[in-house]
Amino acid sequence: MMKKLTSLLLSAALMISLLACGAFAAKTERGVRIAGLKGPTTMGLVNLLDMERSGKASQHYDLQLYGAADEIVPKLIKGELDMAAIPANLAATLYQKTNGGIQVMAVNTLGVLYIVERGDTIHTAEDLRGRTLYVSGKGATPEYAINYILTEAGLDPEKDVDLQFCAEHAECLTNLLANENAVAMLPQPFVTVAQTKASDLRVALDLTEEWDKLQEGGEAPSSMITGVVVARK
């Protein structure tokens, strides 16, 4: 089951091609400098890098991976990077800070966030009341997504749930594996990795499904966009 899920995740990543971005991003002597976060926001770059290795790409791409978005933002603003896969909410901030110098090229990540636990106690957002939840992505899309879902469930994110923010998804995973009562919000492929390390771990909530339920019947329903690709003009 784990091999099948991992295969599906990689296949989905390969479906997303960003070849058109090369015409937009600035060229440098060492190629187009791309930054990505460790996790789902970078999975969409797999096809691009595969094409470069096979000699099918139009130019060289230099990919650098980072653990947090705040490591990428200043490099983009300073011109040390040409493109980046970042949390969706940061795109608007970068656009404003650079007076339109950095723009969105594509949406490359939808959803992929899950509430996981070691046990069988959480079945609705209400079940998170009084629990400690390990989350990565403070000030980014993951925080806004969980706050929205908790609020719509009648919970106060600051009072009813103990949100413990971690620097990286890997830190959330470490806390989850170290404590049998821990609950964490993780993206793929970290969920799959966690399931290979803890046999009692289960996906309690699919936040994409929870988000979509809240959009039903709305005047302007939206999708949970978690990652985009941005580039300098």
Regions from the PLM with identified roles:
Residues 47-49, 113-123, 217-233:
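A bilobed periplasmic-binding-protein/Venus flytrap-type ligand-binding module shared by bacterial periplasmic
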Residues 23-33, 53-59, 98, 120-132:
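Immediate post-signal peptide segment of exported/extracytoplasmic ligand-binding proteins
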Residues 37-77, 94-97, 144-152:
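Short, polar/charged alpha-helical segment
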Residues 89-90, 164, 171-233:
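Pocket-lining segment of extracytoplasmic ligand-binding domains
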Residues 46-60, 143-165, 174, 180, ...:
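Ligand-binding cleft/hinge of the Venus flytrap
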Residues 28-40, 59-65, 103, 130-135, ...:
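Short, well-ordered beta-strand elements
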Residues 1-31:
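Short, low-complexity disordered leader/linker segments with a strong preference
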Residues 34-38, 131-141, 153, 158, ...:
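Short beta-strand->loop
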